[in-house]
Amino acid sequence: MIAAQAKLVYQLNKYYTERCQARKAAIAKTIREVCKVVSDVLKEVEVQEPRFISSLSEIDARYEGLEVISPTEFEVVLYLNQMGVFNFVDDGSLPGCAVLKLSDGRKRSMSLWVEFITASGYLSARKIRSRFQTLVAQAVDKCSYRDVVKMIADTSEVKLRIRERYVVQITPAFKCTGIWPRSAAQWPMPHIPWPGPNRVAEVKAEGFNLLSKECYSLTGKQSSAESDAWVLQFGEAENRLLMGGCRNKCLSVLKTLRDRHLELPGQPLNNYHMKTLLLYECEKHPRETDWDEACLGDRLNGILLQLISCLQCRRCPHYFLPNLDLFQGKPHSALESAAKQTWRLAREILTNPKSLDKL
């Protein structure tokens, strides 16, 4: 048993060195290329409208606010200033979303975003995005990369296609620190020892983002009140939870396997599903020793089996917001074929670790 475990860990480490590192290097190269173009477009936006200040900056070879969706798809979060005159209202009526309401006694004119406030006093995510979309469209025509970048039409999101190969979504957002959403109040679960009080305090202090984008739960049926809502996002908090042990290595292997074998019609699975299931695995295995290098194979198998179970039940709850289903709106047939393909992959890895050489 231990010999089989050791063999799997050896093969996974080899896979990580050969496949995952190559994937990372290729993505890093793409990011540099993409960020040059995006920075140029955002510089042009800022000239037209100084309220939209580019927050895309490189820190320790990482771009702050950039999320890799897949090797050809990225999201850049553009942080906006001055959320201060608004209250964060999160009553759970829209899973995964919240609204920003003008604080009592505050005048509209005190806000930097006065023309985007609705008659009922809400700061409209949709109105801000619509204005930003117009500015980006103009900037694309003027910027020095105009020959290689185009706006993607037929969406309310701000999406650019670069060199006909890459898609970048630019999302206006507010950073919320020092508060924690009511819809995530059940975290951490009282009976689960992970991640421990110190880490919990760090994560809650880190806060979350409010993004101006289409809500998961509302796709295709947005009323105007709902489309004024902002989407909750916990990227930094999640990254902090995944520090230590072989967690990030495990995530890297999962992402590489997904890119190579689970990129299926209907796009049932993305890397965020992998990250979410890894967080649940951390709860199931709360001891740090469970995340030693020697346990990499066990953890990976656990996550793949959990993924199959979620695909078969057609439900994958968000880690912090369990009322939000990350499979919402995905075609059942796509989830079914993803379950079969994941099962084939898991069986292959478990019964014949050497197959990783070909995966």
UniProtKB/Swiss-Prot annotation:
GO terms under biological process: camera-type eye development; cell population proliferation; embryonic body morphogenesis; eye development; positive regulation of cell population proliferation
GO annotation, cellular component aspect: cytoplasm; nucleus
Q: Where are the transmembrane segments?
A: none
Q: What's the superkingdom here? A: Eukaryota
Q: According to its UniProt record, where is this protein located?
A: Nucleus; Cytoplasm
User: Which body tissues produce this protein?
Assistant: Expressed in the adult cerebellum and eye, with lower levels in the adult forebrain. In embryos at 10.5 days post-coitum strongly expressed in the rostral and distal regions of the developing neural retina, with no expression immediately adjacent to the closing optic fissure. Expression is also observed in the dorsal and ventral aspects of the developing forelimb bud and in the developing pharyngeal arches, as well as in the midbrain.
The cross-references to InterPro entries, in alphabetical order and at most eight, read:
Mab-21-like_nuc_Trfase, Mab-21_HhH/H2TH-like, MAB21L/cGLR
Query: What Pfam family is a match, any one?
Result: Mab-21_C
What keywords sit in the KW lines?
Cytoplasm, Developmental protein, Nucleus
Similarity field:
Belongs to the mab-21 family.
Q: Which PANTHER family match?
A: CELL FATE DETERMINING PROTEIN MAB21-RELATED, PROTEIN MAB-21-LIKE 2
Q: Provide the function of this protein.
A: Required for several aspects of embryonic development including normal development of the eye, notochord, neural tube and other organ tissues, and for embryonic turning.
Its protein name is Protein mab-21-like 2
Question: Which species is the source of this protein?
Answer: Mus musculus
